[in-house]
Amino acid sequence: MLERVLLLTLILSFVITVILSPIFIPFLRRLKFGQSIREEGPKSHQKKSGTPTMGGLMILLSILVSSLFVSFQLSIFSMDVLLLLLVTIGFGVLGFIDDFIKVVMKRNLGLTSKQKLIGQLVVAVLFYLGLRNMGLSTEVTIPATSLSIDFGWFYLPLVIVMLVGASNAVNLTDGLDGLVAGTGAIAFGAFAIIAWATNYFEVAIFSAAVVGAVLGFLVFNSHPAKVFMGDTGSLALGGAIAAIAIMAKQEILLIIIGGVFVIETLSVIIQVISFKTRGKRIFKMSPLHHHYELSGWSEWRVVVTFWTVGLLFAMLAIYLEVWIT
Protein backbone atom coordinates (compact mmCIF):
# COMPACT_ATOMS: atom_id res chain seq x y z
CA MET A 1 0.00 0.00 0.00
CA LEU A 2 2.67 2.52 1.03
CA GLU A 3 4.71 1.74 -2.08
CA ARG A 4 1.76 2.89 -4.19
CA VAL A 5 1.36 6.02 -2.07
CA LEU A 6 5.03 6.89 -2.54
CA LEU A 7 4.77 6.38 -6.30
CA LEU A 8 1.57 8.44 -6.53
CA THR A 9 3.16 11.24 -4.47
CA LEU A 10 6.17 11.25 -6.78
CA ILE A 11 3.98 11.31 -9.90
CA LEU A 12 1.73 14.07 -8.52
CA SER A 13 4.72 16.24 -7.63
CA PHE A 14 6.31 15.58 -11.03
CA VAL A 15 3.13 16.50 -12.91
CA ILE A 16 2.66 19.72 -10.93
CA THR A 17 6.20 20.86 -11.77
CA VAL A 18 5.88 19.92 -15.44
CA ILE A 19 2.58 21.81 -15.72
CA LEU A 20 3.85 24.87 -13.84
CA SER A 21 7.15 25.24 -15.69
CA PRO A 22 5.88 26.28 -19.17
CA ILE A 23 3.78 28.95 -17.42
CA PHE A 24 6.37 30.07 -14.92
CA ILE A 25 9.47 30.23 -17.15
CA PRO A 26 8.06 32.85 -19.59
CA PHE A 27 6.81 34.79 -16.55
CA LEU A 28 10.34 34.88 -15.10
CA ARG A 29 11.67 35.95 -18.50
CA ARG A 30 9.15 38.82 -18.72
CA LEU A 31 10.20 39.98 -15.26
CA LYS A 32 13.81 39.84 -16.50
CA PHE A 33 14.80 37.51 -13.67
CA GLY A 34 17.83 36.35 -15.65
CA GLN A 35 20.94 34.69 -14.24
CA SER A 36 24.13 36.76 -14.33
CA ILE A 37 27.28 34.73 -14.96
CA ARG A 38 30.49 35.40 -13.04
CA GLU A 39 33.35 36.68 -15.19
CA GLU A 40 35.82 34.40 -13.40
CA GLY A 41 33.76 31.31 -14.25
CA PRO A 42 34.34 29.05 -17.28
CA LYS A 43 34.08 31.04 -20.52
CA SER A 44 31.65 28.49 -21.95
CA HIS A 45 29.11 29.58 -19.33
CA GLN A 46 28.86 33.17 -20.57
CA LYS A 47 26.25 32.14 -23.15
CA LYS A 48 23.96 31.14 -20.26
CA SER A 49 23.68 34.75 -19.12
CA GLY A 50 20.06 35.85 -18.98
CA THR A 51 18.62 32.35 -18.51
CA PRO A 52 15.63 32.67 -16.12
CA THR A 53 16.48 31.84 -12.52
CA MET A 54 14.52 31.41 -9.25
CA GLY A 55 13.01 28.24 -10.74
CA GLY A 56 13.29 26.79 -7.25
CA LEU A 57 9.92 28.44 -6.59
CA MET A 58 8.31 25.78 -8.81
CA ILE A 59 10.05 23.04 -6.85
CA LEU A 60 8.90 24.51 -3.53
CA LEU A 61 5.29 24.88 -4.66
CA SER A 62 5.21 21.34 -6.01
CA ILE A 63 6.64 19.89 -2.79
CA LEU A 64 4.21 21.91 -0.67
CA VAL A 65 1.08 20.95 -2.62
CA SER A 66 1.88 17.26 -3.16
CA SER A 67 3.12 16.50 0.36
CA LEU A 68 0.20 18.29 2.03
CA PHE A 69 -2.38 16.78 -0.34
CA VAL A 70 -1.20 13.20 0.23
CA SER A 71 -0.73 13.70 3.98
CA PHE A 72 -4.27 15.04 4.43
CA GLN A 73 -5.78 12.42 2.12
CA LEU A 74 -4.23 9.65 4.23
CA SER A 75 -4.90 11.50 7.49
CA ILE A 76 -1.23 11.27 8.44
CA PHE A 77 -0.43 14.98 8.54
CA SER A 78 1.84 15.44 11.54
CA MET A 79 4.55 17.57 13.07
CA ASP A 80 7.04 15.58 10.95
CA VAL A 81 5.66 17.01 7.71
CA LEU A 82 5.29 20.47 9.24
CA LEU A 83 8.93 20.57 10.36
CA LEU A 84 10.21 19.32 7.01
CA LEU A 85 8.20 22.02 5.26
CA LEU A 86 9.47 24.61 7.76
CA VAL A 87 13.09 23.88 6.88
CA THR A 88 12.51 23.53 3.13
CA ILE A 89 10.45 26.71 2.78
CA GLY A 90 12.58 28.59 5.34
CA PHE A 91 15.78 27.93 3.43
CA GLY A 92 13.92 28.53 0.17
CA VAL A 93 12.83 31.99 1.34
CA LEU A 94 16.41 32.76 2.35
CA GLY A 95 17.57 31.69 -1.12
CA PHE A 96 14.83 33.76 -2.76
CA ILE A 97 15.98 36.89 -0.92
CA ASP A 98 19.55 36.16 -2.05
CA ASP A 99 18.41 35.67 -5.66
CA PHE A 100 16.24 38.79 -5.55
CA ILE A 101 19.14 40.95 -4.38
CA LYS A 102 21.40 39.56 -7.13
CA VAL A 103 18.92 39.55 -10.00
CA VAL A 104 16.56 42.45 -9.31
CA MET A 105 18.71 44.79 -7.23
CA LYS A 106 21.77 43.96 -9.39
CA ARG A 107 24.05 43.27 -6.42
CA ASN A 108 26.00 40.28 -7.71
CA LEU A 109 27.10 39.01 -4.30
CA GLY A 110 23.56 38.86 -2.90
CA LEU A 111 23.27 38.40 0.85
CA THR A 112 26.51 38.67 2.79
CA SER A 113 27.88 35.47 4.33
CA LYS A 114 26.93 36.78 7.77
CA GLN A 115 23.35 37.59 6.75
CA LYS A 116 22.91 34.19 5.13
CA LEU A 117 24.34 32.40 8.18
CA ILE A 118 22.01 34.26 10.54
CA GLY A 119 19.02 33.19 8.45
CA GLN A 120 20.22 29.58 8.38
CA LEU A 121 20.75 29.60 12.16
CA VAL A 122 17.24 30.93 12.82
CA VAL A 123 15.64 28.15 10.75
CA ALA A 124 17.93 25.51 12.28
CA VAL A 125 17.11 26.54 15.87
CA LEU A 126 13.36 26.60 15.15
CA PHE A 127 13.67 23.13 13.62
CA TYR A 128 15.57 21.88 16.69
CA LEU A 129 12.94 23.28 19.06
CA GLY A 130 10.29 21.46 17.05
CA LEU A 131 12.29 18.23 17.32
CA ARG A 132 12.58 18.62 21.09
CA ASN A 133 8.85 19.29 21.33
CA MET A 134 8.24 16.01 19.45
CA GLY A 135 10.56 14.19 21.83
CA LEU A 136 12.83 12.99 19.01
CA SER A 137 15.82 11.05 20.30
CA THR A 138 19.20 12.78 20.46
CA GLU A 139 20.94 9.48 19.78
CA VAL A 140 22.86 9.02 16.54
CA THR A 141 23.10 5.48 15.21
CA ILE A 142 26.18 4.22 13.39
CA PRO A 143 25.10 2.65 10.04
CA ALA A 144 25.24 -1.14 9.70
CA THR A 145 25.59 -1.54 13.48
CA SER A 146 23.41 -1.46 16.57
CA LEU A 147 25.72 1.10 18.17
CA SER A 148 24.52 4.61 18.94
CA ILE A 149 25.86 7.74 20.60
CA ASP A 150 23.66 10.03 22.68
CA PHE A 151 24.61 13.63 21.85
CA GLY A 152 22.33 15.13 24.50
CA TRP A 153 22.51 18.93 24.34
CA PHE A 154 25.25 18.66 21.73
CA TYR A 155 22.53 17.55 19.32
CA LEU A 156 21.69 21.23 18.71
CA PRO A 157 25.16 22.02 17.30
CA LEU A 158 24.91 18.84 15.22
CA VAL A 159 21.57 19.92 13.76
CA ILE A 160 22.97 23.37 12.96
CA VAL A 161 26.10 21.96 11.30
CA MET A 162 24.03 19.51 9.23
CA LEU A 163 21.51 22.07 8.01
CA VAL A 164 24.00 24.85 7.32
CA GLY A 165 26.57 22.48 5.85
CA ALA A 166 24.14 20.62 3.59
CA SER A 167 22.45 23.77 2.27
CA ASN A 168 25.80 25.36 1.43
CA ALA A 169 27.12 22.13 -0.10
CA VAL A 170 24.15 21.77 -2.45
CA ASN A 171 24.42 25.47 -3.29
CA LEU A 172 28.09 25.01 -4.26
CA THR A 173 27.22 22.01 -6.43
CA ASP A 174 24.61 23.93 -8.42
CA GLY A 175 26.92 25.07 -11.21
CA LEU A 176 26.02 22.92 -14.22
CA ASP A 177 22.75 22.24 -16.04
CA GLY A 178 20.91 19.40 -14.33
CA LEU A 179 23.66 18.61 -11.84
CA VAL A 180 21.80 19.31 -8.59
CA ALA A 181 18.41 18.25 -9.95
CA GLY A 182 19.78 14.84 -11.00
CA THR A 183 21.95 14.14 -7.96
CA GLY A 184 19.17 15.49 -5.76
CA ALA A 185 16.59 13.12 -7.25
CA ILE A 186 18.93 10.20 -6.56
CA ALA A 187 19.72 11.30 -3.00
CA PHE A 188 16.11 12.00 -2.02
CA GLY A 189 15.07 8.74 -3.68
CA ALA A 190 17.54 6.88 -1.46
CA PHE A 191 16.12 8.57 1.63
CA ALA A 192 12.56 7.72 0.52
CA ILE A 193 13.49 4.03 0.29
CA ILE A 194 15.36 4.03 3.62
CA ALA A 195 12.62 5.98 5.45
CA TRP A 196 10.01 3.57 4.06
CA ALA A 197 12.07 0.52 5.11
CA THR A 198 12.61 1.90 8.63
CA ASN A 199 8.96 2.92 9.16
CA TYR A 200 9.34 6.69 8.93
CA PHE A 201 6.37 6.90 6.59
CA GLU A 202 5.75 10.67 6.70
CA VAL A 203 9.42 11.29 5.92
CA ALA A 204 9.25 8.78 3.05
CA ILE A 205 6.24 10.54 1.54
CA PHE A 206 7.90 13.95 1.81
CA SER A 207 11.08 12.56 0.22
CA ALA A 208 9.02 11.14 -2.66
CA ALA A 209 7.43 14.56 -3.16
CA VAL A 210 10.89 16.12 -3.48
CA VAL A 211 11.99 13.44 -5.96
CA GLY A 212 9.00 14.15 -8.18
CA ALA A 213 9.53 17.90 -7.99
CA VAL A 214 13.21 17.81 -8.96
CA LEU A 215 12.63 15.25 -11.72
CA GLY A 216 9.95 17.52 -13.17
CA PHE A 217 12.33 20.45 -12.91
CA LEU A 218 15.08 18.41 -14.58
CA VAL A 219 12.96 18.26 -17.75
CA PHE A 220 13.57 22.00 -18.15
CA ASN A 221 16.93 22.25 -16.37
CA SER A 222 18.89 19.59 -18.29
CA HIS A 223 21.44 20.87 -20.81
CA PRO A 224 20.80 23.32 -22.37
CA ALA A 225 18.83 24.62 -19.39
CA LYS A 226 15.71 26.70 -19.97
CA VAL A 227 15.64 27.70 -16.30
CA PHE A 228 17.91 27.61 -13.25
CA MET A 229 16.73 26.80 -9.72
CA GLY A 230 18.85 29.58 -8.22
CA ASP A 231 19.66 29.80 -4.53
CA THR A 232 15.90 29.55 -3.98
CA GLY A 233 16.08 25.91 -5.02
CA SER A 234 19.58 24.86 -4.00
CA LEU A 235 19.38 26.18 -0.42
CA ALA A 236 15.90 24.67 -0.01
CA LEU A 237 17.00 21.25 -1.27
CA GLY A 238 20.13 21.31 0.89
CA GLY A 239 18.12 22.15 3.99
CA ALA A 240 15.52 19.53 3.09
CA ILE A 241 17.99 16.67 2.68
CA ALA A 242 19.60 17.41 6.06
CA ALA A 243 16.19 17.70 7.76
CA ILE A 244 15.10 14.38 6.25
CA ALA A 245 18.28 12.69 7.49
CA ILE A 246 17.65 14.04 11.00
CA MET A 247 13.95 13.12 11.06
CA ALA A 248 14.68 9.60 9.78
CA LYS A 249 17.55 9.22 12.28
CA GLN A 250 20.11 8.75 9.50
CA GLU A 251 22.46 11.57 10.45
CA ILE A 252 25.69 9.77 9.56
CA LEU A 253 24.24 8.25 6.41
CA LEU A 254 23.75 11.79 5.06
CA ILE A 255 27.50 11.92 4.42
CA ILE A 256 27.23 8.87 2.14
CA ILE A 257 23.97 9.70 0.37
CA GLY A 258 25.14 13.27 -0.11
CA GLY A 259 28.60 12.08 -1.16
CA VAL A 260 28.69 14.18 -4.34
CA PHE A 261 27.86 17.32 -2.35
CA VAL A 262 30.52 16.44 0.23
CA ILE A 263 33.19 15.95 -2.46
CA GLU A 264 32.28 19.24 -4.16
CA THR A 265 32.55 21.09 -0.84
CA LEU A 266 35.85 19.44 0.06
CA SER A 267 37.29 20.47 -3.31
CA VAL A 268 36.56 24.12 -2.47
CA ILE A 269 38.03 23.81 1.04
CA ILE A 270 41.18 22.06 -0.25
CA GLN A 271 41.59 24.66 -3.00
CA VAL A 272 41.35 27.57 -0.56
CA ILE A 273 43.71 26.01 2.01
CA SER A 274 46.26 25.11 -0.67
CA PHE A 275 46.23 28.59 -2.19
CA LYS A 276 46.48 30.36 1.17
CA THR A 277 49.26 28.14 2.56
CA ARG A 278 51.25 27.25 -0.56
CA GLY A 279 50.21 29.89 -3.07
CA LYS A 280 49.22 27.09 -5.47
CA ARG A 281 45.90 25.72 -6.67
CA ILE A 282 45.34 21.96 -6.75
CA PHE A 283 42.39 22.13 -9.13
CA LYS A 284 42.06 24.22 -12.28
CA MET A 285 38.93 25.67 -10.71
CA SER A 286 36.66 24.73 -7.84
CA PRO A 287 34.11 23.32 -7.15
CA LEU A 288 35.30 20.08 -8.71
CA HIS A 289 32.83 20.06 -11.62
CA HIS A 290 34.53 23.16 -13.05
CA HIS A 291 37.92 21.42 -12.86
CA TYR A 292 36.67 18.71 -15.22
CA GLU A 293 35.10 21.28 -17.52
CA LEU A 294 38.43 23.08 -17.85
CA SER A 295 40.10 19.70 -18.44
CA GLY A 296 38.14 19.36 -21.67
CA TRP A 297 35.10 17.39 -20.52
CA SER A 298 31.76 18.42 -21.99
CA GLU A 299 29.20 19.75 -19.51
CA TRP A 300 26.92 16.78 -20.16
CA ARG A 301 29.76 14.30 -19.53
CA VAL A 302 30.57 15.91 -16.18
CA VAL A 303 26.92 15.90 -15.11
CA VAL A 304 26.28 12.27 -16.07
CA THR A 305 29.51 11.19 -14.34
CA PHE A 306 28.47 12.95 -11.14
CA TRP A 307 24.98 11.41 -11.38
CA THR A 308 26.62 7.99 -11.64
CA VAL A 309 28.80 8.63 -8.60
CA GLY A 310 25.73 9.85 -6.71
CA LEU A 311 23.86 6.67 -7.65
CA LEU A 312 26.72 4.51 -6.36
CA PHE A 313 26.71 6.42 -3.06
CA ALA A 314 22.93 5.98 -2.80
CA MET A 315 23.16 2.23 -3.47
CA LEU A 316 25.87 1.90 -0.81
CA ALA A 317 23.71 3.73 1.74
CA ILE A 318 20.66 1.57 0.99
CA TYR A 319 22.80 -1.55 1.27
CA LEU A 320 24.19 -0.49 4.65
CA GLU A 321 20.85 0.51 6.16
CA VAL A 322 18.31 -1.81 4.54
CA TRP A 323 20.12 -5.05 3.70
CA ILE A 324 22.75 -5.27 6.43
CA THR A 325 20.88 -3.83 9.41
Curated annotation (Swiss-Prot):
Keywords: Cell cycle, Cell division, Cell membrane, Cell shape, Cell wall biogenesis/degradation, Magnesium, Membrane, Metal-binding, Peptidoglycan synthesis, Transferase, Transmembrane, Transmembrane helix. The keyword Cell membrane applies. Its cofactor is Mg(2+). Its main location: membrane. It catalyses: UDP-N-acetyl-alpha-D-muramoyl-L-alanyl-gamma-D-glutamyl-meso-2,6-diaminopimeloyl-D-alanyl-D-alanine + di-trans,octa-cis-undecaprenyl phosphate = di-trans,octa-cis-undecaprenyl diphospho-N-acetyl-alpha-D-muramoyl-L-alanyl-D-glutamyl-meso-2,6-diaminopimeloyl-D-alanyl-D-alanine + UMP. It is a multi-pass membrane protein. The chain crosses the membrane at residues 5-25, 57-77, 81-101, 117-137, 146-166, 178-198, 200-220, 227-247, 252-272, 304-324. One of its GO terms (molecular function) is metal ion binding. It is found in: Cell membrane. The keyword Cell wall biogenesis/degradation applies. Its EC number is 2.7.8.13. GO terms for biological process: cell division; cell wall organization; peptidoglycan biosynthetic process; regulation of cell shape. GO terms for cellular component: plasma membrane. Pathway: Cell wall biogenesis; peptidoglycan biosynthesis. Belongs to the glycosyltransferase 4 family. MraY subfamily. NCBIfam families: mraY (TIGR00445). Catalyzes the initial step of the lipid cycle reactions in the biosynthesis of the cell wall peptidoglycan: transfers peptidoglycan precursor phospho-MurNAc-pentapeptide from UDP-MurNAc-pentapeptide onto the lipid carrier undecaprenyl phosphate, yielding undecaprenyl-pyrophosphoryl-MurNAc-pentapeptide, known as lipid I. This is Phospho-N-acetylmuramoyl-pentapeptide-transferase. It comes from Halalkalibacterium halodurans (strain ATCC BAA-125 / DSM 18197 / FERM 7344 / JCM 9153 / C-125). The lineage of its organism: Bacteria, Bacillati, Bacillota, Bacilli, Bacillales.
